[in-house]
Each structure stands twice: as structure tokens, then as C-alpha cells.
């Protein structure tokens, strides 16, 4: 008897292949979208982890106000847990790029070695071979490129040459995007990064030390285990640096900082991008699973209704409820499994690569790294199968409780009854016959009605969300440069200037309506003294908060009322307050860079 029922199940799949494909298709789309988008965050982070490991990105970086010499490096390198330590000289200078004065950051680099920490990779041209040559970080398509052969005039007492010729372009794990460290030179924003030979610097002290930690490379760098290894070593380095304070006591004070990757902007910024993709995967795929349940419920309900007589025959022949329900559950199970497996394959092969390449317009993570996603695939398929099996069981449960005699007879139509509109004669009498039948059927088949409403509402919500995202993004520009930035022209002083004399010079210009001068500098904000989490911030100082509001519109996040910078205290952005859990009257310190 069981063989006959199994044969009948596969015959049913063949005879109603269109229905089978409808369940198969919606499960495929739902699972593909879920696994593809959900795994994108994991792929992005693991690709970055591989890129960092292959190019020896630092685990710890160390700064001091007096720099470091070889003896300092040797002492700190003996700290328990330190694997490698290297000293690098770095300065920020101003040069002319594309007819604009821009601030560039210059790092020393040992081009004779192919295993440096923060190893750079040549993407175009060659490495420097002669004095006065440099390589520049390659932006890809993120900005206007600096061509090979460009001479950059750079005058600084720390450099032996006064100009540097760009002979190559490189990528570096130290910077993944066009967002660099802050600086006190020029505008406070670094525009380009150059690498020159160590011999090009006149001094013999290093400005920063980079170190790797034993065993850290074996761990996933965005996981807790990685930081469980790095953090104790960082604390030991800080303890070991106490001896250096005695060495440099005669200089009037010694300041030492040891920072891990959580204090490095590029590392944290890329993690945040992956987290955003993960957040999207928690919302949108839910709709596809809901639609899959509705499609399965509708399809199987209709199939069960059509085979009412067949179910009665099976019950009359002695098949129990479980065996009969198993036929339809197997039908939905096979469609869900097939769609789920193929959806996982297609989702993992398409979405992660598309999303990774899209983000790589901004970030320079070299290669896409594939990571096993078995648990995620199993979860996605199990959810789809469970939803469809439950929907199938719900569709046939009520019919299986009836006796064979009732099932073998045609199903009695539902009792007719008046709908609400029939009680409103001046509306109902204007309906023709077709409209009256439609109105009655809407309330007669409530399940189908609500499933249709839910499906249409979900599709409309997705379309509306797409247009909403598009409009929100396009509105950012008009809000930013129409409402927030009310000024037409912004300029920067190359050096400190007398405000009053500047006003006197330009107040007679009829083309200028008003001028306001403020002071701003870059800095870092710390969540607390006990934590290393920092954020780059712009600190603005004004002498007249009301006048400043006429040039830059500030509003409170909740009330949307106009905000004015107070004479005593400070205003912070909503995002900074949220990230650091700040409340009114809180005190926080910031450090100038």
C-alpha cells in the first residue's frame, strides 16, 4: 500500500508540475536572497582578514611624543607575545596636486624586503630605485589619479630631496579606502599617501612602531578570540614602556600609546560595512519566506480541495491520516528541498561577489575569499522546509478529520449570507451582477482574500522601500548643501590670519553678503579612559553661536528645533552621542592630532 501511495505522489508531481515549480521557484528566490546577502558580510570580513594576513597588517601600533630609536625597538620587541616589530618614519607635508595645495602623508619603506609589516603591493609602474622617487597609493576609480611621472614638490627638513617623482602605484592593507588619518598640517585632511625609501629621511628616529602578536594571524581578526590574544600583549607593552619614561625623563615628560586595530579607522570602517549588509539580511529575506508560505498554502489548499474525492477513497481503502498527509507533505518537502539547495548554490555564487565588487569601488581589499557556509545553508533550507511543511499540513488537516463518506460526496457550498455592502442600498444597487459576485466572494473566501492582500502589500512595500531609499539618498545632497551648509563658498587659511583685517578687506565687496570665520581642527574622541575605542572628530570653535547658525544649520535630533552652540559646553552629533552613549551634561575629553 505504501508503494502505491509513493508512486501516486510522484505521479502527482508530474501531473501538476506547474504547481510544483511555483513552490520550488519562490523557495529558490527566498533562500538565494537570504544566503547571498547574509553571507556577504561574512565573505567581506574574511576576505579582509585574508588580505590583512597575506600582507602582514599590524596588530599593535605604538606612538610616543619623542619617537623611538633602535634600542627602544629592541626593548619593546622583547615583550612577551610580540612576534615582530618594525619602526617606520612618517611625516605629513603639503604639496601641489592637481593645482591644489593638498596634505600628503609620507611613510618610510624598505623596498629591498618583500616581507615588511603593512606590506605594499605594486599595482602599476615600479618601486623606487633612485633618490627622489616614490610610489603612491592607488585609488582605483575612487578619485582623479596622479599619473606616473608626476613630480611632487615637497620641502621639509626631514627629507633629503625637495621633489619626488611618482614611479609606481601601490595598494596597502593599512588604508582600505580614501579616508585617512587626521593631521594638524594644512586642512587637517590627508589627500594622498606616499612611500619613499628609508634613506630619504634625514633623521634616525622612528615616529611609529608596528608589531604583530604571536598566534593572532591564525584567528579571524574580527572575532573576539583575536582580541583575546592581542589585548593582553598590548597591556604588557604598555607596562614595558614605563622604563622608557625614565629614559626620556630629562625631556620633560614622556607620553606613550599602544593601540590595536580597533583604533584604526580603515579596519573598523570595513567592519561596519559588513555589519550593514548583515542588518539588511535580517529584514528583507523575511518577506520572501512569508511569500513562500503564502504560495505553498494557496497551492496546497487548492490541490487538497481538488482531490477531496481521492482523499476519501484513500481513507476508505484503509490509509491512515499520517500516510495521506504524507503525500502532500512530501510534495511540498521535495519542492522546498530542491528550491532551497539550488537557491543556496545560486545565492552563494552570485550575491556575495556582486556585493564585494560593489564595495571594492571604495575599498581596496584585493581578493575575494570564499568561506564555508554550511551552517547558514542548512538553516536557510530548514526554515523554508519547515514553513512550507507547516503550511501544507494546515491546508489538509481539516479535510483529514472528515469521514470517507463525507469526502466522497461533493463539498457542500457555504451558506450564503449578506455582506456589509448589501445593507447599504444606495451603493449595492449600482453594482452589476459580476461586481456583486466579486464582493460576496471576497468575504466568502477570507483566507484567499487575506493571502492576496498580504502578498500585494509585501510586494508594494518592497517597491516603496526601493523608491524610498533612492529618494532618501538623493535628498541628502539638497539637505546637506541647502539646509545645513547655507554658505556658498568655503575657504581655508594656509596659516593663522587676523580675523578683523580679513573682514575689513572684504566687507566692501558688494558680491559678498556676509562672512564668518571659525576655527576648526581634527581630533580623536575616546569612549572612556579605560577603553581604546576612538573616533576621528572635527572640533569647531566659534565666537558667536547665533551667527554661525546662519551659515551652518544645526537642529536637535528629536525635536528638530534649531540648535545654537552654547558659550559654555559643546554640541555633539547624534551619531557620536549614540556611539559613545553620551547624555546631557556628560563630560568627555578629546585629543588634538
Model-derived segments and their meaning:
Residues 3, 400-419:
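Short cytosolic juxtamembrane segments of multi-pass membrane proteins
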Residues 62, 433-566, 574:
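Juxtamembrane segments of multi-pass membrane proteins
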Residues 293, 297-302, 309, 333-365, ...:
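Small-residue-rich transmembrane alpha-helices
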Residues 29-36, 288-296, 338, 342-346, ...:
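Hydrophobic alpha-helical membrane-associated segments
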Residues 73-88, 318, 505-521:
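Short acidic amphipathic segments
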Residues 1-32, 329, 333, 417-458:
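N-terminal Sec/SRP start-transfer signal
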Residues 2-293, 302, 321, 361, ...:
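Membrane transport/envelope proteins' first extracytoplasmic loop
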Residues 8, 12-18, 294-334:
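Interfacial "coupling" helices/loops that link adjacent transmembrane helices in transporter permeases
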Amino acid at each position: 500500500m505504501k508503494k502505491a501511495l509513493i508512486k501516486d505522489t510522484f505521479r502527482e508531481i508530474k501531473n501538476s508540475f506547474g504547481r510544483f515549480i511555483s513552490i520550488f521557484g519562490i523557495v529558490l528566490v527566498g533562500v538565494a536572497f537570504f544566503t547571498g546577502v547574509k553571507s556577504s558580510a561574512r565573505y567581506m570580513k574574511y576576505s579582509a582578514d585574508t588580505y590583512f594576513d597575506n600582507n602582514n597588517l599590524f596588530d599593535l601600533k605604538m606612538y610616543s611624543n619623542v619617537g623611538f630609536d633602535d634600542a627602544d625597538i629592541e626593548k619593546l620587541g622583547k615583550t612577551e607575545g610580540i612576534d615582530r616589530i618594525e619602526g617606520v618614519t612618517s611625516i605629513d607635508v603639503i604639496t601641489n596636486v592637481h593645482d591644489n595645495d593638498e596634505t600628503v602623508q609620507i611613510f618610510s619603506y624598505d623596498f629591498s624586503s618583500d616581507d615588511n609589516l603593512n606590506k605594499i603591493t605594486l599595482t602599476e609602474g615600479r618601486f623606487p630605485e633612485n633618490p627622489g622617487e616614490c610610489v603612491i597609493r592607488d585609488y582605483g576609480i575612487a578619485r582623479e589619479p596622479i599619473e606616473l611621472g608626476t613630480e611632487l614638490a615637497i620641502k621639509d627638513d626631514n627629507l633629503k630631496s625637495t621633489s619626488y617623482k611618482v614611479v609606481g602605484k601601490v595598494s596597502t592593507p593599512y588604508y582600505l579606502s580614501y579616508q585617512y588619518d587626521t593631521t594638524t598640517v594644512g586642512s587637517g585632511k590627508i589627500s594622498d599617501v606616499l612611500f619613499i625609501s628609508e634613506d630619504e629621511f634625514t633623521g634616525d628616529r622612528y615616529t611609529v612602531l608596528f608589531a604583530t602578536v604571536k598566534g593572532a594571524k591564525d584567528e579571524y581578526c574580527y572575532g573576539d578570540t583575536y582580541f583575546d590574544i592581542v589585548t593582553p600583549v598590548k597591556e604588557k607593552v604598555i607596562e614595558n614602556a614605563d622604563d622608557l619614561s625614565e629614559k626620556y625623563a630629562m625631556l620633560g615628560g614622556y607620553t606613550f600609546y599602544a593601540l590595536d586595530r580597533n583604533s584604526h579607522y580603515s579596519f573598523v570602517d570595513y567592519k561596519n560595512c559588513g555589519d550593514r549588509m548583515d542588518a539588511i539580511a535580517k529584514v528583507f529575506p523575511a518577506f520572501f519566506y512569508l511569500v513562500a508560505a503564502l504560495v505553498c498554502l494557496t497551492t496546497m489548499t487548492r490541490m487538497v480541495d481538488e482531490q477531496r474525492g481521492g482523499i476519501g477513497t484513500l481513507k476508505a481503502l484503509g490509509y491512515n491520516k499520517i500516510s495521506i498527509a504524507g503525500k502532500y507533505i512530501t510534495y511540498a518537502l521535495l519542492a522546498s528541498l530542491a528550491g532551497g539547495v539550488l537557491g543556496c548554490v545560486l545565492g552563494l555564487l552570485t550575491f556575495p561577489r556582486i556585493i564585494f565588487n560593489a564595495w571594492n569601488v571604495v575599498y581596496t581589499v584585493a581578493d575575494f575569499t570564499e568561506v564555508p557556509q554550511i551552517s547558514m545553508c542548512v538553516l536557510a533550507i530548514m526554515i523554508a522546509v519547515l514553513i512550507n511543511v507547516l503550511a501544507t499540513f494546515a491546508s489538509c488537516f481539516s479535510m483529514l478529520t472528515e469521514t470517507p463518506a463525507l469526502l466522497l460526496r461533493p463539498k457542500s457550498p457555504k451558506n450564503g449570507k449578506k455582506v456589509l455592502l448589501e445593507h447599504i442600498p444606495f451603493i449595492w444597487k449600482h453594482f452589476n451582477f459580476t461586481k456583486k459576485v466579486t464582493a460576496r466572494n471576497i468575504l466568502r473566501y477570507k483566507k484567499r482574500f487575506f493571502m492576496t492582500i498580504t502578498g500585494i502589500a509585501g510586494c508594494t512595500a518592497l517597491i516603496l522601500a526601493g523608491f524610498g531609499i533612492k529618494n532618501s539618498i538623493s535628498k541628502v545632497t539638497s539637505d546637506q548643501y541647502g539646509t545645513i551648509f547655507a554658505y556658498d563658498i568655503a575657504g581655508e587659511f594656509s596659516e593663522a590670519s587676523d580675523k578683523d583685517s580679513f573682514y575689513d578687506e572684504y566687507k566692501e565687496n558688494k558680491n559678498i553678503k556676509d562672512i564668518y570665520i571659525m576655527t576648526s581642527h581634527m581630533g580623536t574622541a575616546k569612549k572612556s579612559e579605560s577603553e581604546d575605542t576612538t573616533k576621528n572628530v572635527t572640533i569647531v570653535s566659534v565666537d558667536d553661536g547665533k551667527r554661525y547658525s546662519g551659515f551652518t544649520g544645526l537642529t536637535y535630533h528629536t525635536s528638530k528645533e534649531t540648535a545654537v552652540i552654547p558659550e559654555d559646553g559643546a554640541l555633539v552629533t547624534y551619531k557620536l552621542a549614540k556611539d559613545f552613549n553620551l547624555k546631557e551634561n556628560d563630560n568627555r575629553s578629546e585629543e588634538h592630532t
